[in-house]
Design a protein with these regions (language model features):
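Helix-loop interface residues and adjacent transmembrane-helix termini in multi-pass membrane transporters
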Residues: 16-20, 94, 171-174, 196
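Alpha-helical transmembrane segments within multi-pass membrane transporters and channels
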Residues: 1-29, 182, 186
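Transmembrane helix-bundle core of multi-pass membrane transporters
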Residues: 22-100, 121-124, 143-152
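Start (N-cap) of specific transmembrane helices in multi-pass transporter permeases
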Residues: 118-130
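Hydrophobic/aromatic residues within transmembrane alpha-helices
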Residues: 32, 110-111, 164, 186
Length: 197
């Protein structure tokens, strides 16, 4: 929920201040939110999460019911991420708001002329992005069994790279959830492959 409010803050700032490019606002608030997190935590990891939070990051689903000879597991986090990707695909491709998001990304002035409430949709988009970022942070904290103030440092660069590799435009109006999924997979393969000795 905190992530959603951080995203809403960005969306309101961009729409009210009429920022020429959203990167100005989002990069500025990135440092504000990161500094606030360090201030609240005192710069040290926070531990003592509930079993439910640990389950998000470290939980496993036993797949022996599929008739496999060996005990195989599927991480809960993989299932959660797959569900999020499916829901976002359905939202962007099968709802009116999803179509409006593409229209606003392509040409906000034309979308406004077509009767779309651009500011409202932008606030919704930034709120949703903040909610999903918070959800991802919760999974990461569950995986590490503690919240590190510097966890996810420079993850924004990986996210931007994955989106661009997946065919999304930094200027808006282009991109698909499946393309972003492919970009995430490519980035994961490259990152893991480069870490091998």
């Amino acid at each position: 929920v905190i992530g959603m409010f951080c995203g809403m803050f960005n969306g309101l700032g961009i729409t009210i201040l009429r920022m020429p490019h959203p990167f100005i606002m989002t990069l500025g608030t990135l440092y504000i939110f990161r500094g606030t997190g360090n201030l609240i935590s005192g710069g040290v990891p926070i531990s003592g999460f509930t079993e439910e939070v640990r389950l998000l990051g470290n939980g496993r689903i036993d797949l022996t019911w599929l008739g496999l000879k060996e005990s195989q597991y599927l991480p809960v986090s993989v299932v959660l991420i797959a569900v999020v990707f499916f829901l976002m695909w359905a939202f962007l491709n099968h709802t009116r708001t999803g179509k409006w998001i593409y229209a606003i990304g392509g040409n906000p002035n034309a979308a406004r002329a077509a009767g779309i409430n651009v500011n409202k949709i932008l606030v919704i988009v930034y709120s949703l992005c903040g909610l999903l970022a918070g959800f991802g942070a919760l999974i990461l904290a569950g995986r590490a069994d503690s919240g590190y103030p510097n966890a996810g440092l420079n993850a924004e660069l990986d996210a931007i790279a994955a989106c661009i590799i997946g065919g999304a435009s930094v200027f808006g109006g282009r991109g698909t959830v499946l393309g972003v999924f492919a970009g995430v997979m490519i980035m994961g393969i490259l990152r893991n492959g480069l870490n091998l000795n």
